[in-house]
UniProtKB/Swiss-Prot annotation:
Protein name: Fructose import ATP-binding protein FrcA
GO molecular function: ATP binding; ATP hydrolysis activity
Catalysed reactions, as listed in the record: D-fructose(out) + ATP + H2O = D-fructose(in) + ADP + phosphate + H(+)
Zinc in keyword set: no
Membrane topology (UniProt): Peripheral membrane protein
Cellular location(s): Cell inner membrane
Enzyme class (EC, first level): translocase
Binding site for ATP: 39-46
Lineage, uppermost ranks: Bacteria, Pseudomonadati, Pseudomonadota, Alphaproteobacteria, Hyphomicrobiales
The species this protein was found in: Rhizobium meliloti (Ensifer meliloti)
Pfam families listed in its UniProt record: ABC_tran
Main localization category: membrane
Physiological role: Part of the high-affinity ABC transporter complex FrcBCA involved in fructose uptake. Is also a high-affinity transporter for ribose and mannose. Responsible for energy coupling to the transport system.
GO CC terms, sorted: plasma membrane
Length: 260
């Protein structure tokens, strides 16, 4: 591709005792694209995503964001750098309101002495910004911004998590199995949300086992096998059967896909 990648990894190694989860793994994410990451169970894709999102520190290798070497020691550092992750378990607090969940860990304090010394939250500002972010993604069918997340449907909860990531992910959004355990209708809405986020210019890393969803929204598909990137394919040029065959080792990918 003519553009320079916004996020790259080279030679990542991660060991857990005698198990090598990442074996000199490479990764490239380009501006404005949806890159799907697929692989069989135990292929190491989760470890790779954890490495680029700050959840684990690689034993070897280098990660670069916008061309600059980075080393995250925690997910918080990754978030501060502009990389947001929507986890499979959503990482939402069910008892808290939608607005509180949107700003969880990033609460807005009141100006002046009330915020500085008494740590009072500026709930009006948080509610206003949360409402604006949900509206941007067409999610204001949720009537009450102060209702508890536990009262929402699965698709609505996923929408809140996606809206939070889109609101604060200034450079990259990572989505881990965003349609898992959702019905057909709710999955459709989440896929539309993913495309909405992409239209806003944010590149997305999509981890999913749902091949129809992957082939519907991805611009490129990164296939991970035996701890490393096996190949990168364009979903317009290959079938789902091809992808599964590459992923399981039943079929060798073409040379140009391996070099991608």
């Amino acid at each position: 591709m003519a553009q320079e990648p916004i996020l790259t990894a080279r030679g990542l190694v991660k060991r857990y005792g005698r198990v090598t989860a990442l074996d000199r793994a490479d990764f490239d994410l380009y501006p404005g694209e949806i890159l799907a990451v697929i692989g069989d169970n135990g292929a190491g894709k989760s470890s790779m995503i954890k490495a680029i999102s700050g959840a684990v520190t690689p034993d070897e290798g280098e990660i670069r964001l916008e061309g600059k070497p980075i080393q995250f020691r925690s997910p918080m550092e990754a978030r501060q750098a502009g990389i947001e992750t929507v986890y499979q378990n959503l990482a939402l607090s069910p008892a808290l309101s939608i607005a509180d969940n949107m700003f969880l860990g990033r609460e807005i304090r009141k100006p002046g002495i009330m915020g500085k010394w008494f740590r009072s939250l500026d709930r009006a500002a948080m509610e206003k910004q949360a409402r604006a972010k949900l509206s941007e993604l067409g999610l204001m069918t949720i009537q009450n911004i102060n209702q508890a997340v536990e009262t929402l449907s699965g698709g609505q909860r996923q929408g809140v998590a996606v809206a939070r990531a889109a609101a604060f992910g200034s450079k990259v959004v990572i989505m881990d199995e965003p349609t898992a355990a959702l019905g057909v209708k709710e999955s459709r809405r989440v896929l539309e949300l993913i495309l909405d986020v992409r239209r806003r210019g944010l590149p997305i890393v999509l981890i999913s086992h749902n091949m129809p969803h992957v082939f519907e929204v991805a611009d490129r598909i990164h296939i991970h096998r035996l701890g490393r990137r096996l190949c990168v394919i364009n979903p317009k040029d290959y079938t789902m059967s091809d992808a599964v065959a590459f992923m399981t080792g039943a079929k060798e990918p073409p040379r140009e896909a391996i070099a991608a």
